[in-house]
């Protein structure tokens, strides 16, 4: 690595706005929240996955416009699908909302330069849309839980 490139990274680090620091912090913590939801449901940690997801989350916080966020979401979702066998657990919407927040915040951080601030109108719009997505996610989970717990007699026509 040449010194000019390193100096560019240092200048970018120093020029990062406070708002971008908060966005990057959420980018690191949200997928860890999804892993915590899996741990809370299953009762055991996945140490290797914790390291992998932490590294991927940190990489996506540093470069939010890269594909590392996709890989982190895929690892978290695959871990959930492999280890959890219940659809009626309240940890499912918690993990889903964590991954939704991760995606939304990472995309928002990638939209603006590191030294820039997100305009309030844009921030409110993104927050409103993310909250709508989260509420639809939780609503769909509630519908699945209600249908899963329903005791309906068999029907040959269905």
Report the location of each language-model feature.
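Membrane-helix interface "capping/anchor" motifs
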Residues: 58-72
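Alpha-helical transmembrane segments and their cytosolic membrane-interface
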Residues: 1-46, 93-105, 115-118, 128-133, ...
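Small-residue-rich segments of transmembrane alpha-helices in multi-pass membrane proteins
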Residues: 74-87, 124-135
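Alpha-helical transmembrane segments and their membrane-interface exit regions
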Residues: 52-62, 78-83, 97-107
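Transmembrane helix interruption/hinge and helix-loop junction motifs
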Residues: 40-47, 62-66, 83-89
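Membrane-interface helix-boundary motifs at transmembrane edges
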Residues: 59, 118-122
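Generic detector of solvent-exposed, compositionally biased contiguous segments
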Residues: 36-43, 51-59
């Amino acid at each position: 690595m040449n010194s000019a490139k390193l100096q560019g990274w240092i200048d970018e680090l120093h020029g990062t706005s406070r708002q971008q620091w908060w966005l990057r912090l959420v980018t690191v913590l949200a997928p860890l929240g999804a892993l915590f939801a899996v741990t809370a449901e299953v009762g055991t940690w996945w140490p290797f996955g914790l390291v992998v997801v932490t590294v991927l989350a940190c990489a996506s916080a540093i470069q939010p416009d890269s594909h590392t966020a996709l890989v982190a979401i895929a690892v978290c979702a695959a871990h959930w699908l492999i280890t959890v066998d219940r659809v009626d657990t309240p940890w499912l919407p918690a993990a889903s909302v964590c991954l939704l927040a991760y995606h939304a915040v990472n995309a928002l951080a990638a939209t603006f330069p590191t030294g820039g601030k997100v305009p309030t109108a844009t921030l409110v719009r993104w927050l409103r849309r993310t909250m709508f997505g989260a509420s639809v996610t939780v609503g769909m989970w509630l519908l699945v839980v209600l249908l899963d717990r329903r005791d309906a007699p068999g029907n040959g026509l269905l």
